[in-house]
Structures are given as structure tokens and as C-alpha cells.
């Protein structure tokens, strides 16, 4: 039953995010925030597919333990694409609120992203095994969490300052995604059921993409 639920949900998620991303790319002009957000959604969906597709195959066949290599490789790729996702989201923030300068902020975003990716590339992560070390799971997610916190603060203050109704909950979608993701990192190996928290975490990302898609439709409607 769990295999069916997860597989159906993952298919729905990937199709939804990729479809919305492509529609935003096609429905916006080059260099705009929505073109960037569309690219961000495609990166999100494409990156997650490297993990979710083998996971669905594993759940529906011989089990997760027999798919250590493809699952590990998928997690590895997803860890990098998720970092790129937040870098792109930072630039969405800059474009939406017409931010100029802020060189130190940009350096911080790139520094945290670089540290995160370097940590993800370390062999100590043992990505291609069934037992990845918890210590390295925590280490590689520290700069990722700091990057997420930075983006949360930026969107919260900017949306409030500009009274941006369309993006007023963007910060909350990121809070929820990290809130559901953290227990999975810490305790999923102890209690596999905790891994089910990835479903609401994924829903938070769908909400992130929907916020931008709905904002694009609203703005396009005003211009027509």
C-alpha cells in the first residue's frame, strides 16, 4: 500500500512541477523573474526525478535495500540540484524586488552553496551504500539550512515591506520544507516511517512553484 501511495504521489509531483515550470518558461519573457522561476521549477523536478524514479522502482519491485547504487546516486544529484534551486530563488528575490548591489549577500549565498556542494562531493558520505553516515548527513545540511534560512528572511521582509500579496507566503513554504526535511535527515534510518515526511515536504515545494505560477498568470492577465 505504501509503495502505491508513494509512487502515485511522486508521479503527480514530478508531472506537476515540470509542467508548471515549462509553462512559466514559455509564458514569460527572457530575463524576467518568471522565466527564472520556471527554470528553477524544472531544475527542481528534473533533479528530484533522479531519486524518485529509482525509489518508485525499488518500492514496487525488490525493495529499497536492493537499489542502493541508483538511490544513492539520485540523492547525490538531488543534493546538488536543490542547492542550485535556492541560488536561483535568491535571484528571483532580486528580480522581483528590484534589488541592486548587496554584494556581501550574494557572496554569502555563493559561499554557502559552494560549501554545501563540496561537502556533498566528499567520499565520506558513502552515497552508494545502504548506510550513509548520520554525521555527514548533518554536516552537509548545515550550510544548506543556513542558505534556506537566509532566503526565508529575505522573502519574509521583502514581501512584508512591499505588501506583496502574491508572494506573502513564499517564506512559509521554505520553512515547511525544512521543517519536514530535518527529521528525515536525523531519524529516518532509525524509523523508516519518518521518511513519509518527505510527502508534506514535497507538497511545500509544489506550493512554492504554484505561488510563482499564479503570480505570473495574475500579472499576465493585467497586461492583456
Language-model-derived ranges and their functions:
Residues 1-18:
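Hydrophobic transmembrane alpha-helical segments in integral membrane proteins
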Residues 2-5, 64-76, 129-142, 191-201:
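Non-cytosolic membrane-interface motifs at loop->transmembrane helix junctions
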Residues 6, 106-109, 130-148, 164-171, ...:
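A loop-to-helix transmembrane entry motif
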Residues 25-37, 93-105, 130-133, 156-168, ...:
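Membrane-interface helix-boundary motifs at transmembrane edges
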Amino acid at each position: 500500500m505504501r509503495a502505491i501511495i508513494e509512487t502515485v504521489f511522486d508521479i503527480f509531483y514530478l508531472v506537476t512541477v515540470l509542467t508548471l515550470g515549462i509553462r512559466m518558461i514559455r509564458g514569460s519573457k527572457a530575463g524576467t523573474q518568471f522565466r527564472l522561476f520556471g527554470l528553477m521549477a524544472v531544475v527542481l523536478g528534473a533533479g528530484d526525478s533522479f531519486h524518485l524514479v529509482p525509489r518508485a522502482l525499488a518500492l514496487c519491485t525488490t525493495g529499497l535495500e536492493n537499489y542502493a547504487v541508483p538511490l544513492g546516486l539520485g540523492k547525490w544529484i538531488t543534493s546538488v540540484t536543490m542547492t542550485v534551486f535556492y541560488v536561483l530563488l535568491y535571484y528571483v528575490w532580486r528580480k522581483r524586488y528590484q534589488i541592486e548591489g548587496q554584494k556581501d549577500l550574494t557572496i554569502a549565498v555563493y559561499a554557502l552553496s559552494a560549501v554545501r556542494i563540496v561537502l556533498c562531493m566528499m567520499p565520506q558520505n558513502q552515497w552508494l551504500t545502504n548506510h550513509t553516515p548520520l554525521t555527514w548527513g548533518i554536516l552537509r545540511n548545515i550550510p544548506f539550512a543556513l542558505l534556506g534560512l537566509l532566503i526565508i528572511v529575505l522573502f519574509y521582509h521583502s514581501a512584508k515591506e512591499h505588501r506583496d500579496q502574491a508572494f506573502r507566503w513564499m517564506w512559509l513554504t521554505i520553512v515547511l520544507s525544512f521543517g519536514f526535511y530535518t527529521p528525515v535527515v536525523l531519524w529516518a534510518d532509525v524509523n523508516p516511517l519518518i521518511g513519509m515526511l518527505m510527502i508534506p515536504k514535497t507538497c511545500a515545494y509544489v506550493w512554492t512553484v504554484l505561488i510563482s505560477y499564479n503570480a505570473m498568470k495574475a500579472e499576465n492577465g493585467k497586461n492583456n
